Amino acid sequence: MEANTIKNDFQTKEQPSKLEIQTWIVDYIAELLEVEANKIDVTIPFDRYGLDSSAAVGLAGDLEEWLDEELDPTMLYDYPTIESLTEHLIESLSD
């Protein structure tokens, strides 16, 4: 999946908001699973959505490209929900 397939609305800003990051991840997972975005619960662990290690690495890589920030490809194991990953990203981007 290409990172640019999901619209980057913060191109003129320095950093995306928590909502923008969370929405990007939700949209990404929804597109990957071919479901509506409103079916994705941000508190459900990624593995419950059936994301295997290659899908997790793909998500991390596309998110890295979208944010234009270097990210650890294993971060989805440390932050196993959309909610926890979003919180982590907001904290790390503001450093």
Explain the meaning of each model-derived region.
Residues 1-95:
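Flexible, low-complexity inter-domain linkers and amphipathic docking helices that mediate domain-domain
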